[in-house]
Amino acid sequence: MAADNAGRWPGQPPGPPAPTHPASSVSLRWRVMLLAMSMVVISVVLMAVAVFAVTSRALYDDIDNQLRSRAQMLIESRSLDIDPGKAIEGTAYSDMNAMFYIPGRSKYTANQQGQTLPVGQPEQDVMDGTLLLSLRTVEHQRVLAIRLASGNTLLLSKSLAPTGKVLKRLGTVLLIVGGLGVAVAAIAGGMVASAGLRPVGRLTQAAERVARTDDLRPIPVIGNDELARLTETFNMMLRALAESRERQARLVTDAGHELRTPLTSLRTNVELLMESMKPGAPRIPEEDMAELRTDVIAQIEEMSTLVGDLVDLTRDDAGNAVHETVEITEVIDRSLERVRRRRNDIQFDVAVTPWQVYGDAAGLGRAVLNLLDNAAKWSPPGGRVGVGLTQIDALHAELVVSDRGPGIPPQERALVFERFFRSTSARSMPGSGLGLAIVKQVVLKHGGTLRIEDTVPGGTPPGTAMHVVLPGRPSPAGSDEAER
């Protein structure tokens, strides 16, 4: 992701979002509960396996220790040398099977009821002297064979059946306890999921309420955790949506109000023309007819300008603009050509530095044209308008459009960028009251700033200087200041 953002322009919006994957059909509550159950099941299984393994190993080690201890006792007591038959018979009382083998002479054996001490090849090897010791499990018995220093062999075995029963009972207990643990985990997971996701449920209900009823009331914020911040973010979205709808309603209302005046005047003039064309109606003098035609054309142009401005505003609001690298100097040149055709009596003093901005070329062109049109409109006949573009730091350049008109009072400077605002002195001038609103909207969307100052502070008249700061970079064509 860092590599994707490294080459991004100042103010450039992020690229298209990554493709999303189909959402799971399992609800978030079930996923949380299943996750908790899975963790508990894994923990219970690991614990049960560990307990069973440790217990099993301990029980088998205990049997081995019993066999070794019994053999050691028989050897150290020398009872096998004194009376081997009695010693082997006594071993049977300790739940063990025993055999004492004296090569070439005799074999003493004592077994538990229903059991036989198994003698296999390992035990035979000990009896033959090939091995000194053998310890193994065979026929559900643990068998120990030891070669004594006298050449005799002692064999002991103990049944594993009691140990198997203990381990079986232990497995049953672990299974029951584990099952209860999973059940408790499922119940606890469901309760935790219900309690933890209750704010998400409120958000879902609020979103459904907005979609169903257009009710944009904020949701109460409880706590200060992540879900509370999510609720605050959702409330911010609701406020932004409410403000957007309010702006749309205000735009429609203001547009209807602004269109009413030229439409009424146009309708009156058209009706007057139609009445004059009826048979027997008095003819309008040619001078008045020419004035009437001029008024109709002016009213149509006024409505066309207003509709065009409204289209520009709604286009920017919709966010459908195509962003690309824009040469601001070229935008200024094209705008100057259009303004000069309308006001060829105005002298434009241009000094610009090559500068590029990543953004909407059409929107930037409209903003620059509106600034130049506004300056030309308020300039006296034969006046001069200054147009300057200078780099103020590595990432920003400032466009200044100044005139020598009457200026804007300080108390109105914050209002001139509002839609349809027209000061008392401006109401007698042509215009829709949307030009500077478009400028503000375009500049802010490109991450810029704007302010109003006097061209000649304290002068009579003071004039107006519009300062627009735009992020971007120097044009590769060069950074020397160009004079036009």
Curated annotation (Swiss-Prot):
This is Signal transduction histidine-protein kinase/phosphatase MprB. It is found in: Cell membrane. CDD domains: HAMP, HATPase, HisKA. The gene is mprB. Keywords: ATP-binding, Cell membrane, Hydrolase, Kinase, Magnesium, Manganese, Membrane, Nucleotide-binding, Phosphoprotein, Protein phosphatase, Stress response, Transferase, Transmembrane, Transmembrane helix, Two-component regulatory system, Virulence. Its EC number is 2.7.13.3, 3.1.3.-. GO terms for molecular function: ATP binding; phosphoprotein phosphatase activity; phosphorelay sensor kinase activity. Gene3D superfamilies: 1.10.287.130, 6.10.340.10, Histidine kinase-like ATPase, C-terminal domain (3.30.565.10). InterPro entries: 2C_sensor_his_kinase, HAMP_dom, HATPase_C_sf, His_kinase_dom, HisK_dim/P_dom, HisK_dim/P_sf, Sig_transdc_His_kin-like_C. Member of the two-component regulatory system MprB/MprA which contributes to maintaining a balance among several systems involved in stress resistance and is required for establishment and maintenance of persistent infection in the host. In response to environmental signals MprB acts both as a membrane-associated protein kinase that undergoes autophosphorylation and subsequently transfers the phosphate to MprA, and a protein phosphatase that dephosphorylates phospho-MprA. The modification Phosphohistidine is found at H257. Residues 53-172 are extracellular. Residues 254-474 form the Histidine kinase domain. Autophosphorylated. It is a multi-pass membrane protein. Residues 1-23 are annotated as: Disordered. GO terms for cellular component: plasma membrane. The keyword ATP-binding applies. It comes from the Bacteria. Residues 1-10 have a biased composition (Low complexity). The chain crosses the membrane at residues 32-52, 173-193. It catalyses: ATP + protein L-histidine = ADP + protein N-phospho-L-histidine. Its cofactor is Mg(2+); Mn(2+). The keyword Transport does not apply. Residues 1-31, 194-484 are cytoplasmic. Residues 11-20 have a biased composition (Pro residues).
